[in-house]
């Protein structure tokens, strides 16, 4: 059964401006530990790839927070939710700490889809309850 649906569109130019103003502090506030490694790796290779990565993760976390109905209120936080790619490239949501506990107690599973173009990153999340 569907528990919630969330979507978000993010202007990559706004993320770029924020990153320029605040430096890596912005990325470190939004990204979890494994995400920050990927961000730095991608940005070192091609600046635009790092920026797109940050924007898609920002967008996906916004969409996820909407799908679970919490917004960015505890136990949901930027760093407690990571969007990591499986070896196949499929994005997957990995949760940590109190958010992982909250999610497990409700027997929820999440599916995420990401896309980006030159100026925009978009995410769609469906959260469903696991069968009894």
Curated annotation (Swiss-Prot):
Keywords: Cytoplasm, Fatty acid biosynthesis, Fatty acid metabolism, Lipid biosynthesis, Lipid metabolism, Magnesium, Metal-binding, Transferase
Stored SUPFAM superfamilies: 4'-phosphopantetheinyl transferase (SSF56214)
A Pfam cross-reference name: ACPS
Domain of life per record: Bacteria
Cofactor(s) named in the record: Mg(2+)
One CC-aspect GO term: cytoplasm
Protein family (similarity comment): Belongs to the P-Pant transferase superfamily. AcpS family.
NCBIfam families named among the record's database cross-references: acpS, pantethn_trn
Name of protein: Holo-[acyl-carrier-protein] synthase
Protein species of origin: Leptothrix cholodnii (strain ATCC 51168 / LMG 8142 / SP-6) (Leptothrix discophora (strain SP-6))
Organism ancestry: Bacteria, Pseudomonadati, Pseudomonadota, Betaproteobacteria, Burkholderiales
């Amino acid at each position: 059964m569907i528990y919630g649906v969330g979507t978000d569109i993010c202007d990559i130019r706004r993320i770029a401006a924020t990153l320029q103003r605040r430096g890596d502090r912005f990325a470190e506030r939004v990204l979890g530990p494994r995400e920050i490694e990927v961000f730095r790796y991608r940005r070192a290779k091609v600046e635009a790839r790092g920026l797109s990565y940050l924007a898609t993760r920002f967008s996906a976390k916004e969409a996820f927070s909407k799908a679970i109905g919490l917004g960015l209120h505890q136990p949901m936080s930027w760093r407690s939710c990571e969007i990591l790619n499986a070896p196949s490239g499929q994005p997957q949501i990995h949760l940590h700490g109190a958010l992982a506990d909250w999610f497990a107690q409700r027997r929820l599973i999440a599916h995420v889809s990401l896309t980006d173009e030159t100026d925009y990153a978009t995410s769609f999340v469906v959260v469903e309850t696991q069968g009894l």
